[in-house]
């Protein structure tokens, strides 16, 4: 039964990821006054399947001087971690109900750094290694603010479980009292998933393609799938933390529809940002985090800690 539940989670996530690539190409197309993919199937609807077939049928070439085992493990690990992160997410019921669900997601997202680092090192290429080091520095840096923002939210809900966060938001979304945190969280998730305007790991002008420059065919497709799965996952987490739907025991499907629509809306904003903004310079990227976001989030954390103590109150769900 567990295997059936697992497949019922993995297959829709993979399908969503496939059609997100199409949605992105269509969105960018229309924002640049062109059509986007429109040949394969009606209105280009079968384009993701054509891309998948093309990539997985091609021969996976690798550099002679590369470290074979790590070269193959890195993309597999990237996709595995991207899928494992979905397990504690309530949609409205999680696959595995973990007490420390929020902490689990934060810890698992940190592991994604290893796949990027290994891929850059195992490729035995200067460009790939520089791209990987950039990605690691960026991801580790922005995880600091993500963790502090999550701490502020957990101080409001009083529990590490995601289902408690849903209960906390029965009366009002946490987006309303903590909108500065939500804005910083959203920008940090853009940086965490290496998306524009923070896609410095893939700076074509200086790094050819970034950490995946030596990858082709299937392994490259796995990195690509992991990136888009992470995007949907981060937006799903944002929807759960800041804009959770009310969960009714009688109509759990209403929660699922509401949750899906919010995730789709946030994902579309990700694509919109990519079409609208140019890439940051690397020093600006780090300046934004260490000089702007970190002091602000620390101040907000102190505020959220002091407020319940000052009012002699406790969070609602403890």
Curated annotation (Swiss-Prot):
Q: Describe the reaction catalysed, as an equation.
A: a ubiquinone + NADH + 5 H(+)(in) = a ubiquinol + NAD(+) + 4 H(+)(out)
- Protein's cellular compartments: Mitochondrion inner membrane
The record's keywords, sorted A to Z, are: Electron transport, Membrane, Mitochondrion, Mitochondrion inner membrane, NAD, Respiratory chain, Translocase, Transmembrane, Transmembrane helix, Transport, Ubiquinone
* Membrane topology field: Multi-pass membrane protein
Q: What is its EC number?
A: 7.1.1.2
In the record, biological process GO terms are: aerobic respiration
Q: Which Gene Ontology terms of cellular component type are present?
A: mitochondrial inner membrane
Give the matching Pfam families. NADHdh (PF00146)
An annotated Gene Ontology molecular function: NADH dehydrogenase (ubiquinone) activity
Q: List the disulfide bonds.
A: none
Q: Does the keyword Transport apply?
A: yes
Family annotation (InterPro entries): NADH_UbQ_OxRdtase_su1/FPO, NADH_UbQ_OxRdtase_su1_CS
Instruction: Give the family from UniProt.
Output: Belongs to the complex I subunit 1 family.
Q: What does this protein do?
A: Core subunit of the mitochondrial membrane respiratory chain NADH dehydrogenase (Complex I) that is believed to belong to the minimal assembly required for catalysis. Complex I functions in the transfer of electrons from NADH to the respiratory chain. The immediate electron acceptor for the enzyme is believed to be ubiquinone.
Q: What is this protein called?
A: NADH-ubiquinone oxidoreductase chain 1
Gene name per UniProt: MT-ND1
């Amino acid at each position: 039964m567990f295997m059936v539940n697992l497949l019922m989670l993995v297959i829709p996530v993979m399908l969503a990821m496939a059609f997100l690539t199409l949605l992105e190409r269509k969105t960018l197309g229309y924002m640049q006054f062109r059509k986007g993919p429109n040949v394969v199937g009606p209105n280009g609807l079968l384009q993701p399947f054509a891309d998948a077939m093309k990539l997985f049928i091609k021969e996976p070439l690798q550099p002679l001087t590369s470290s074979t085992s790590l070269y193959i493990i890195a993309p597999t690990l990237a996709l595995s971690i991207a899928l494992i992160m979905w397990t504690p997410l309530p949609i409205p019921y999680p696959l595995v109900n973990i007490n420390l669900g929020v902490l689990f997601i934060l810890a698992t997202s940190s592991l994604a750094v290893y796949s990027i680092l290994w891929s850059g090192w195992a490729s035995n290429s200067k460009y790939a290694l520089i791209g990987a080091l950039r990605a690691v520095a960026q991801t580790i840096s922005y995880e600091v603010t993500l963790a502090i923002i999550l701490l502020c939210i957990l101080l409001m809900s009083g529990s590490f479980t995601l289902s408690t966060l849903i209960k906390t938001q029965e009366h009002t979304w946490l987006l309303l009292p903590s909108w500065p945190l939500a804005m910083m969280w959203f920008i940090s998730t853009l940086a965490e998933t290496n998306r524009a305007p923070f896609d410095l790991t893939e700076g074509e002008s200086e790094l050819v393609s970034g950490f995946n420059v030596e990858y082709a065919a299937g392994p490259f497709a796995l990195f690509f799938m992991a990136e888009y799965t992470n995007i949907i996952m981060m937006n799903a987490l944002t929807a759960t933390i800041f804009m959770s739907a009310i969960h009714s025991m009688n109509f759990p499907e209403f929660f699922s529809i509401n949750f899906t629509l919010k995730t789709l809306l946030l994902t579309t904003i990700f694509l919109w940002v990519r079409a609208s903004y140019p890439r940051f310079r690397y020093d600006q990227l780090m300046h934004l985090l260490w000089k702007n976001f970190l002091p602000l989030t620390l101040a907000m954390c102190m505020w959220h800690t002091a407020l319940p103590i000052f009012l002699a109150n406790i969070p609602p769900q403890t």
